[in-house]
């Protein structure tokens, strides 16, 4: 895995808690992790960020306060299987650890 991708969690079709766990593991070693998603996975990315921010606060999580940072939205041009170019919505959510 390249260094630039270690601070990024890409949201797909796995169970929600798999992404929450992955993000928390990365936050134990890094000050900031970016959650990225596109298309139908955007809602799941928001859910992951909210679970991390709210549940760790209530549980007294040991790596410090976790806050949601910058949120970026946009779109990408992707070519579909039928050869047409389509706009797909994207989101990037920064989750930060305060020491």
Placement of each model-derived feature along the sequence:
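A short linear-motif detector with a strong N-terminal bias
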Residues: 13-14, 46, 70-73
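Histone-fold modules and their flanking histone-like tails across chromatin and transcription assemblies
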Residues: 1-27
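Structured beta-strand/turn binding interfaces of compact recognition modules in eukaryotic regulators
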Residues: 14, 38, 96
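C-terminal edge-of-domain segments
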Residues: 64-99
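Charged, well-structured alpha/beta interaction segments
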Residues: 28-49, 53-56
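Beta-strand-rich binding-surface signature
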Residues: 6-8, 24, 30-34, 65-70, ...
